[in-house]
């Protein structure tokens, strides 16, 4: 497994110097650590660390999936420099322990979360090394700091899925359908002047992008909500940009190991959206979402509001591998194959997009489930929306 991961990096990573890392030397150190490992979890950790050393948001090791599903029952996000709980699942241990939206997370198992390391927490605790219990230091609005231990819900599943079996196949498809429902696009209208398009992912076909734009073309202002949108397909990004300009747009330059070429979004011409555009982003807006925001901002096509984006814009390809013949174990590697250099000669990787107007919710806003950012955007567009009502439009959805 380590050899396969190393070979993927060696042959496919966009930077032939591997960011100054001696890949062969690091691989030998990893081999020795694997020999001393006492569990599969330790082995996976060694392999993962080899890739984490690249400090590249899109270069990661994905270990074999676990048969047990782990659910922590609470969700957090960084706003500005602070991390807050944004959702707590009903009837979870987190709810029983008194954890609530708006609680500021000071430490997770002794480590202070921040904008730079939060994604690593998710990677370790969800994919690499799930924990049955998480120790939290939290601060509720108007209260003193406290420490709680939150137990995760662990659901044991099947270790082997036979997709030729009807029952197993149906269970697998239901799981995919549940994921799809969490990522539904939604358009909300406010009178004749303002529409909000909640876009959770860049997962639409070109025709679907056009259809969505056609629905909102009549409004004077479109608010495109890309908060918590981690990106997606380049095809979707290019078509979306093409719908907001009357000319072709050179987004930037794709820099690969052996070539460079421009990334161009072709205009949809007179069929696109010609009116006012407001884009909402936050610290979870990544990849295609922040590239879109950057283009809108640099071309002065609209206003970008919210929080600084995540700064995770490298282009990557996922390489799937398997071990075994009759009983197959799958694992994979995401390898960055290109960087995107913007027209100013810089990459958004690590820096992100700073909004034209920084708007951050407070702990009190999150506790009251108010969406002050969306309410401010609607008001700026000439509409009216109470923050409490705004908070009900796109609530956090838990997987069944």
Language-model features and meaning:
Residues 111-122, 146:
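Short, Lys/Arg- and Gly-enriched loop/turn segments at beta-strand edges
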Residues 17-83, 133, 144-187, 385-400:
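Extended, small/polar residue-biased N-terminal targeting/export presequences
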Residues 356-397:
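Low-complexity, Gly/Ser/Thr/Pro-rich intrinsically disordered linker/tail segments
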Residues 93, 104-107, 133, 221, ...:
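Residue-level marker of beta-strand positions
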Residues 66-107, 111-115, 204:
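PDZ/PDZ-like domain segments forming the peptide/carboxylate-binding groove
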Residues 1-18:
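Mature N-terminal segment immediately following signal peptide/propeptide cleavage
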Residues 119-132:
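Short, compositionally biased
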Residues 131-132, 137-326:
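Cleft-lining beta-strand/loop regions that shape enzyme active-site pockets
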């Amino acid at each position: 497994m380590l050899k396969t991961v190393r070979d993927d990096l060696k042959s496919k990573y966009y930077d032939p110097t591997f960011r100054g890392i001696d890949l062969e030397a690091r691989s030998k150190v990893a081999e020795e650590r694997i020999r001393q490992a006492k569990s599969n979890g330790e082995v996976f950790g060694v392999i993962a660390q080899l890739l984490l050393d690249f400090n590249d948001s899109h270069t990661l090791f994905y270990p074999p999936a676990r048969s047990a599903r782990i659910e922590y029952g609470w969700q957090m996000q960084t706003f500005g420099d602070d991390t807050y709980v944004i959702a707590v699942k009903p009837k979870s241990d987190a709810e029983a322990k008194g954890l609530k939206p708006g609680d500021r997370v000071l430490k997770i198992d002794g480590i202070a979360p921040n904008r730079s390391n939060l994604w690593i927490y998710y990677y370790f605790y969800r994919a690499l090394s799930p924990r049955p219990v998480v120790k939290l230091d939290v601060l509720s609005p108007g209260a003193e700091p406290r420490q709680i231990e939150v137990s995760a819900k662990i659901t044991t599943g099947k270790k082997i899925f036979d997709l030729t079996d009807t029952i197993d196949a149906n269970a697998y498809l239901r799981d995919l359908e549940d994921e799809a429902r969490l990522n539904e696009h939604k358009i909300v209208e406010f009178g004749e002047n303002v529409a909000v398009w909640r876009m959770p992912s860049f997962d639409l076909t070109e025709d679907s992008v056009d259809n969505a734009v056609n629905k909102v073309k009549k409004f004077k202002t479109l608010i495109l909500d890309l908060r918590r949108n981690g990106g997606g397909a380049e095809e979707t990004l290019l078509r979306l940009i093409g719908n907001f300009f009357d000319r072709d747009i050179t987004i930037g330059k794709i820099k690969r190991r052996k070539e460079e070429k421009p990334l161009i979004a072709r205009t949809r011409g007179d069929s696109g959206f010609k009116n006012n555009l407001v884009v909402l982003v936050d610290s979870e807006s990544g990849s295609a979402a922040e590239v879109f925001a950057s283009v809108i901002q640099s071309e002065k096509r609209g206003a970008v509001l919210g929080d600084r984006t995540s700064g995770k814009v490298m282009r990557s390809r996922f390489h799937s591998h398997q071990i075994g013949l009759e009983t197959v174990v799958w694992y994979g590697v995401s390898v960055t194959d290109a960087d995107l250099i913007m027209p100013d000669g810089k990459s958004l990787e690590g820096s992100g997009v700073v909004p034209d107007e920084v708007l951050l919710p407070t702990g009190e806003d999150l506790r009251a489930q108010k969406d002050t950012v969306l309410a401010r955007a609607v008001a700026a567009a000439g509409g009216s929306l109470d923050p409490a009502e705004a908070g009900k439009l796109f609530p956090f959805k838990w997987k069944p």
